[in-house]
Amino acid sequence: KVEEGLKAYSEYNILLDGNETSYYLWKAVKCQEIISQNSPIPAMKAVKSDAEIAGYRRAMVRDGVAMVKFLKWLIPAVEAGGETEISIDKKLTALRAEQDLFRDISFDTIAGYQEHGAIVHYEASPETDIPLKPEGLLLLDSGAQYQDATTDITRTIALGPVTDEMKHIYTLVLKGHIQLELAKFPDGASGTQLDALARECMWREGLNFLHGTGHGVGSYLNVHEGPHQVRMEYMPAPLRAGMTLTDEPGLYLAGKFGVRIENTVLIQDYKETDFGKFLQIESLT
């Protein structure tokens, strides 16, 4: 047991991360000294090996096949009637399950139609599930665990005619998504320094979103992985080549609809100049 091991260990000092260690385990330590600081493991894990990156590339192809099959099926199915937020979630999971090395979904799917799309972390239940109609927007945030990688993708899909307001909001989100994906930046920059790239076109119109623009993605591990993030709040973790990240700006109009566009991306070397090493972003999705 962990507790017994900590009580019995006394030869060297022990490093404990106060953000991740329970008070119960902390009090069980009987070593000479507790060094309280962030664990070095997440930062090392965040930079993916060549084998892990190759796994992402393979898994993204398979996940893309499932998504394309789903998108081909979706519109005719909605037009035929009978589909709901829950039923289309089950269909997408079934298509992913046909792919090699599929093990499970990587998180509970967010399938929000019309006003439900404006709820950032909406999850359909039997009580909230609504039928889909051949009109308006469906926000679909989903992912899978394959044995060689973890995926995370969001698409906002027009199920039929949409309003001019929907088109405008979608365009702003797409602009922000592209702006971040095209970024070139110094090695070691923080995600906070990049965050405004995805928001600037929205800020011009007095619009904003209140979630992070991007998070790390594990390799057949947690779909949300740190320590690096792209968000407005200061995040000191440096961005390095080999890190995976999401690019997912959005806009949400309460009671009306929401738009989010998300790819999983890879940070890569760009060039080295007299001013240092620079990085760029490649979409893996």
Residue ranges and their predicted role:
Residues 1-285:
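Active-site neighborhoods and metal-handling regions in enzymes and metal-associated proteins
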